Amino acid sequence: MKKLWFALIGVVLAFSASAAEFSDGKQYVELDKPATQEPQVLEFFSFYCPHCYQFEQVYHVPDAVKKALPEGTKMTRYHVDFLGPLGKNLTQAWAVAMALGVEDKITPLMFDAVQKTQTVQKPEDIREVFVKAGVSAEEFDGALNSFVVKSLVAQQEKAAADLQLRGVPAMFVNGKYMIKNDGLDTSSMDGYVKQYADVVKFLITKK
């Protein structure tokens, strides 16, 4: 019993120590907005953004965050339209990916096509990436101008405007907290990824 007691104390102290490391203005910024009723994490990115490529495809930060979240926490990723000549087209394409449930298939292929091979130069090229991901051209075209996709595009644009988004990658917790990349430990990739996920987990339960 005594061993169990000390073990529990150790867990509490470890949690308190890690929580104490995170403060407003350093690892996150508290926004002058009401918190969402349900816990949620909202990430903004762009297929044109080199830092987003690193964030998603090299560091795999969103994957680490997902794993750290309490069960039932909603995590959503939105594309921004203010970067690149096809920014609006890619935001619409991301809405298609969301509607069809193929975000995980599209993400690596589209990042590669936009940034590495640079084979996405016109709207038609975006369709080809979906075809490569296993979505037929007919299915893509049918979804592109659907009501669902139009609604998802509007949601992405409204969320970015409401949060006065100025850059990506960006992650918001409960609509009230924004993670500050420059306040995190970047001395090692593993340390950065773990701390990022820990800050998000801390903010999810912050009252």
UniProtKB/Swiss-Prot annotation:
Cystine crosslinks: 49-52
Signal peptide: 1-19
Record keywords: Disulfide bond, Periplasm, Redox-active center, Signal
Principal location: periplasm
GO cellular component, one term: periplasmic space
Domain of life: Bacteria
Similarity section: Belongs to the thioredoxin family. DsbA subfamily.
Protein name, UniProt field: Thiol:disulfide interchange protein DsbA
Native source organism of the sequence: Pectobacterium carotovorum subsp. carotovorum
Gene (name only): dsbA
